[in-house]
Amino acid sequence: MLYLTFSITTVSMIRSIFIILFYYSFCIQPLFAQAITQVHFQYHAVTAAQKDSTVQQWLQPYTDSLNHYLNSVIGFSLENVYKKKGGGPLGNFITAAMLQQALLQTATKIDAAFLHPAGIKGFLPQGNITIGTLYALLPYTNRLVVQQISGAILEEFVHRMAADGGWLSTGINYAIDVYGKAKNIRIQQQPILPNAVYHIVVSDYMANGGSNCSMLRSLPSIPLHTTLIETCKNYIQSFTNNHEPITVNKAAQFTNIYE
Amino acid sequence: MNRRNFIQNTVKAGLFTGISLLPAGNLLAKNSMTETQLTILHTNDTHSQIFPFENNSGPYAGMGGIESRKKIIEQIRGTGNPALLLDAGDFCDDSSIYDAYKGKVELEAMRLLGYDAFTLGEKDFLGGIDNLATQLKHTGMKPIVCNYDFTHTSLQNWYQPYTIIQKENLKIGVLGVLLPLHDKISISGIENLVYLDAVMQANKTAAILQQQHCDIIICLSHLGDRYADGRISDEVLAKNNQCIDVIIGGHTHQFFKQPRLYKNKSSSYTLVNQAGWGGIQMGQLDYVFTNTTNKKLIRTKNILLREKKNE
């Protein structure tokens, strides 16, 4: 798709494209048989110079105070907290934060929290936790949504997660059999009742049907206007305010059955 | 639209300009006419990407950033031809810089780069309507929106349905449309933003611009290029307008390699272009205006912005 033609300046290099030069005949008036229209369509990459003093000067105060903000310490972790297949301690921690935030904002009982596995990148390192740590950990712009879900649809949703090897969750426990089917699903330690109504908190990405969550799309929803980063920040600070390092639930939310 | 279609369409468009040139008898007579070249440069969905994409951002690593963008803009302005710099909305997004400054930096960056006009996208409302109004007023930036009624919000009196920009002897009409926000974002007071039909409003506004004898009418659109379900999009607007020459699109993050050309309601053509997202791509459309004929598109360049690698 990229062909070579020419370059604009010494600092910019163009990998181009194609030039179309076409002629066409105009039959009605043979006197002016030929008109030329020349159109260049170009699609190319440009390497621009890196620094611009005007931009640097204007941006400096913002980057300084932004870095100060990103480096501000909000909590402490005693150990590295990792994401594992289907969640792991880090998945438990972040979904626990979602559950707490939803509880605080809606003042209703929230039964479970879920997050799609790709929502987290990397791990939470041992030591001071800064705001910047959270931006690196949660690069996507997810916001929280509380949804009302019937037991039957919730079960369908759990099967969808189990087929993937389990997602990040808090409040729900199940077993996954060799066929990737969820078994013995329990919400808040109780079996799921198909006709009962539950409240769950998920990311807006999932609520809009992302990651094959189409069953969530038409559920009654309350958007919380809170980002996942803000949610985790508040959760971590709730430990720090008690002069404690963060507590992480390491128990797996589901078990695999091999038989 | 594939390349062949585009060429075919362009031949048709060329025919039109060709026909109007024919009575002049001789194409060499072109020199006796006064010619003005106009370059339209445009971005969309820059999503708070003030800096180039970080090294761990996969295919986009090291791309974009306002310093690269400024260089391109300066190069084009340096040619001496009038240049128009436009943005089709979503200059903000959830990011550390947006969380810290709520859109102030993004708007100041647009002011610094000398944007001539811009419209809004749904993400620009993330910090709330009042916050958006405050940031727009503080930076002195007025968005172009013709299919929303903001009268009952703090944005009242701080947006225009269209603007007319004079560049040398050219009169350029710019209008703006954005998608129905209600199912895209959830912010308090959203019920006070009154959506008006995009096609109807765009036609109404473009007609005003035509009455004012604009040489070219450009629509900044945050509708999205096209959808399978046929809901309102740039494609729908392009096919159902009377006198819009160019639609600068956004929202769907499409990296157009070349513009799409549609036949509109007045058997003329409306061109749609979109420049990806994140400030990775810039679109460029070069028009030539002569005093005897109309405008003619002579060149389109869609430019990918890469930062110089440290070696």
Q: Residue spans of the language-model regions?
A:
Chain B
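Acidic, metal/ion-coordinating pockets
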Residues: R3, I7-K308
